[in-house]
Amino acid sequence: MTADTSLRPADHPAVKSGKVGVLLVNLGTPDGTDYTSMRRYLREFLTDRRVIEWSPWKWYPILFGVVLNTRPRKVGKAYELIWNKEKNESYLRTYTRNQSELMAEHLKDLATVKVDWAMRYGTPSIASRIEALKQEGCDRIVLFPLYPQYAAATTATVNDKAFQKLLSMRWQPALRTVPDYHDDETYIEALATSVEKHLATLDWKPEMLLASFHGIPMSYFKQGDPYYCQCQKTGRLLRERLGLTKENFMVTFQSRFGPEEWLQPYTDKTVEKLAQDGVKRIAVINPGFVSDCLETLEEIAEQAAHSFHENGGEKFAHIPCLNDGEDGMTVLEKVVRRELQGWI
């Protein structure tokens, strides 16, 4: 719906309105693998109070005194292993841009809808893309944090950043935030199909399928974060859809950081133990990641595979994320069309 301009004064400034924006938001990515780019990205990420809930008086001396002086080089080297050399960017940026472009194509029947993308950390920022959508005439925006399972350290911090931008705007767009979809049947079916398709390309059958989710500190869970429960439900629904038993399917948690206890069982320890216990063939899927990134391509496909082989395992397969494939886009489109109801 477009505003009636016939009643405007002759000197009224041109104003665009009547559009609906869809903003896809993922975690973030450094602009490069060099020390400066990595430090800038890690500083923004690790100063987020949703990510590290310690008091700044306790955390900042460690962060600025140690972590930001040593970790950028280490993480930069890891990114170099999985960097998209063709586009000179991380694959997370590549896939998120592709998802945005494909979503726009899928929604071309909705003439008033504009689709864009942003990153919580790094560029393009959430604030810049909300501003761009507003300038394009979007007086309503669907904000889509690309996380199937809700966590304060992921979904909530995306929402926080969007709300922070709105605080600075005189003419705020209406904002609708997308909830989690951890038990959506289309999402579960897409995960199951990706497992079946990938395993069909192998000449061996895994004895164990791990569903590895990003971890969070146990203290966050105990304070009421629903993430653990949602991961477990996703895992159970996927196991049931694949017809597997608890003896050949496990939910595990990866990417722990710092001295705190995190959600368990830990993926890295589980992979080691499986190999040490005589399991020779395993496959790993990352249901909580919409797109492949450092945590899947390097931590699982490289580090976990190496650990499994070093401890006696023989066959290891990493099942790619849904990324910008047809099944993955079907999931995202379903969620977006559902959340657009009443606005189009």
UniProtKB/Swiss-Prot annotation:
User: Mind telling me which InterPro entries this protein's record contains?
Assistant: Ferrochelatase (IPR001015), Ferrochelatase_AS (IPR019772), Ferrochelatase_C (IPR033644), Ferrochelatase_N (IPR033659)
Which GO molecular function annotations are given, in alphabetical order? Answer: ferrochelatase activity; metal ion binding
Q: Which reaction does it catalyse?
A: heme b + 2 H(+) = protoporphyrin IX + Fe(2+)
What function does the entry list? Answer: Catalyzes the ferrous insertion into protoporphyrin IX.
Q: Does the keyword Metal-binding apply?
A: yes
Keyword annotations: Cytoplasm, Heme biosynthesis, Iron, Lyase, Metal-binding, Porphyrin biosynthesis
Q: Where in the cell is it found?
A: Cytoplasm
Pfam families linked to this entry: Ferrochelatase
Cellular component terms (Gene Ontology): cytoplasm
**Enzyme class of the recorded protein, top EC level:** lyase
| UniProt keyword Zinc present | no
* Pathway it works in: Porphyrin-containing compound metabolism; protoheme biosynthesis; protoheme from protoporphyrin-IX: step 1/1
For this protein, the Enzyme Commission number is: 4.98.1.1
Which protein family is named in the record? Belongs to the ferrochelatase family.
Its primary localisation, in coarse terms, equals cytoplasm
Q: What's the protein called, per UniProt?
A: Ferrochelatase
Q: Where does Fe cation bind?
A: 214, 295
Q: Which NCBIfam families match?
A: hemH
Source species taxonomy: Bacteria, Pseudomonadati, Pseudomonadota, Alphaproteobacteria, Hyphomicrobiales
GO BP terms: namely: heme biosynthetic process
